[in-house]
């Protein structure tokens, strides 16, 4: 069964992160929300506290990562750990999805050069 990690930083857009989780879980895909902070509680763009399933340091193997938009996308883009993770997934030809502002991190990681990207 495929495993998907939805990365979340403070300011994440609720519908872009949790909508993905909802749809994939309904399809019986194994999905974890992952806080990039040391603590599991992440504050959404509308100030809703959401308890992530894991933190970045607790991440297991995933077939795919999802990078949601919202103000949290800038935090993801500026986090060297996330950039390294994106580069690793690209190098290993695993799936990477990014929504709305999320592709900024892909651009910074240099994984979308000469590729067709839709957001």
Name every feature range the model reports, one short phrase each.
Residues 118-119:
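Active-site oxyanion/phosphate-handling segment shared across diverse enzymes
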